[in-house]
């Protein structure tokens, strides 16, 4: 299949989670997608949890916390609520966050 869209970055920023840092539930209000590139973290670093707009059929949960490692990228629709639990360890978790839209390419 051929991908006939351009990726247009809207915003890019870095986040460093020091001990005690966290993010409250939020979404990214523009249309499009948001992504996280995990740069530096430990297995017990704080996790990003997504709040699903539907119940998981297996366990009826609306929370999804992917197990990620450095180098992983998560991309979700910008309307999806998400948060990060507090950093309880003495290690700085580093991520690169970005928002983007897809622009169709016309031939």
Which residues does each PLM region occupy?
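Short, well-structured hydrophobic secondary-structure segments
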Residues: 1-2
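Catalytic phosphate/metal-binding cores of nucleic-acid and nucleotide-processing enzymes, i.e., regions
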Residues: 5
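Catalytic core of non-heme Fe(II) oxygenases with the double-stranded beta-helix
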Residues: 8-75, 79-80, 85, 91-95, ...
